[in-house]
Structure formats: structure tokens, C-alpha cells
Design a protein with these regions (language model features):
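Gly/Pro/Ser/Thr-rich low-complexity, intrinsically disordered segments predominantly at protein N-termini
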Residues: 1-220
Length: 220
């Protein structure tokens, strides 16, 4: 489990006790609202940097997944019911392989996605790094990425489910790549240069995807 203090911030989520039924009546498609441990967690609108990063990752991962027909990539606010009677989260990005697409119903995904990506906001630190970390691990998420763009952080962390069902940290390669064990085609993994996320402006999705595809061809 990752622990970090979360100082008061205007982006801190609003919390109130509620049943799951009350959560369903509150949630909509215009804001991120989650339900865990008997409380509704309503998040403030994210910062522009958060949305820029989430949008870049969604497009890049989505393009790779679509090119090889690997499954489905979703973005918040989409409910993920991690287990029956368990928490309902709305990850910034999540990936579901083709074999698990039947776990979608018209309103939500039921179960653990293979990949979850959360972009940390000042008000979501404890949720992303402690509570969700534990929930995703228990639910069986195979890979969890934490992208923290805060100026004093600027980190990307990857945790991968090991044989014991526990999240284990994954190091980036010597040249700064984060390689996925979940997003793979013909033995070649999806990867990204961590430095891409801190470039201004962010790289063009098409150019980044081509680098990924070119490296895969070299491995084949």
C-alpha cells in the first residue's frame, strides 16, 4: 500500500454517507462520482493538465488497442463495479480485453479491468494511492498505473499483479520506457516513454504510436 498525506485543497472531493442505491441516483455522465465503504465521493472538476494527460493516454492506448483489436478502452465517468456489493469506481482510463467484454452491461463494467490508469489530482492523492490501490489489488486488476503530474512529483508508477495476487512495483527500462504486460500484440508490448508525459506540448499521438509500432516490428 502506498501512503501519502493529502493536504487540504480546493480540489478535495465532497463526501457523504449513502447507500449504493443513492449513489446510482446521484451518478451521471457529467462528473466523476464514486461509491466506497458506504459513502459517495464526488470529485471537483479536474485541472487542465490532468485532462491533457488523460486525453493523451486515452488516445495513445486507444489507438494501440484499436489497431490490433485487443478489446475496449474506456474513460471516466464510467462505473466499474469491482465486485458484487463492493466499491464502484470511475477510473480515469481502463482497458478490458476482448474475452471480458461480456462483463459490460448497459450502465457499467462488472469486475476487474486488466489495466487501470489514474492521473493523480491534488484532491485525489489518498484515494488513488491508498484506497483505490487496495481495492484494485483485491479485485484482481492486472496492472495499475499511477501518473502524478504535480510539480513536486512528476512520476509514473506501475504495479503489476504477481503470482500471489499482490501488486508488485515495475521499474521503467534503462531508456525510460514503461512497458505493459497487459497490452501486447504478437509478443510486442505497448510502451511509453515516461518523459513524453512531461513534454510541453505533449507529443503527437500519431508520432508516439509509430515509435511503439516500429519497435514492435524490430522484435518480430
Amino acid at each position: 500500500m502506498i501512503a501519502e498525506a493529502n493536504a487540504p485543497d480546493r480540489t478535495a472531493p465532497v463526501r457523504r454517507w449513502a447507500t449504493y442505491r443513492e449513489y446510482l441516483a446521484t451518478a451521471d455522465d457529467t462528473r466523476i462520482v464514486e461509491w466506497a465503504d458506504g459513502e459517495i465521493i464526488e470529485y471537483m472538476p479536474p485541472l487542465i493538465e490532468h485532462q491533457d494527460l488523460a486525453g493523451f493516454l486515452l488516445q495513445l492506448i486507444g489507438a494501440f488497442v484499436a489497431r490490433f483489436n485487443l478489446g475496449k478502452v474506456m474513460i471516466a465517468p464510467t462505473e466499474v463495479k469491482l465486485w458484487p456489493e463492493g466499491p464502484s469506481r470511475e477510473p480515469d482510463i481502463f482497458f478490458v480485453p476482448t474475452a471480458d467484454l461480456s462483463n459490460f452491461d448497459p450502465w457499467r463494467f462488472n469486475g476487474a479491468p486488466d489495466l487501470v490508469v489514474e492521473v493523480v489530482s491534488p484532491g485525489s492523492v489518498r484515494e488513488d494511492r491508498v484506497r483505490k490501490f487496495t481495492e484494485y489489488e483485491l479485485a484482481g486488476v492486472r496492472e495499475y498505473w499511477l501518473v502524478d503530474p504535480r510539480p513536486h512529483q512528476r512520476t509514473v508508477e506501475c504495479y503489476r499483479r504477481d503470482a500471489a495476487g499482490v501488486f508488485a512495483p515495475v521499474d521503467v527500462t534503462e531508456d525510460g520506457r514503461l512497458c505493459s504486460a497487459v497490452l501486447i500484440h504478437a509478443g510486442a508490448p505497448f510502451w511509453l516513454h515516461v518523459d513524453w508525459l512531461w513534454q510541453e506540448p505533449l507529443p503527437k499521438v500519431e508520432a508516439a504510436l509509430q515509435q511503439i509500432l516500429d519497435s514492435g516490428e524490430q522484435l518480430s
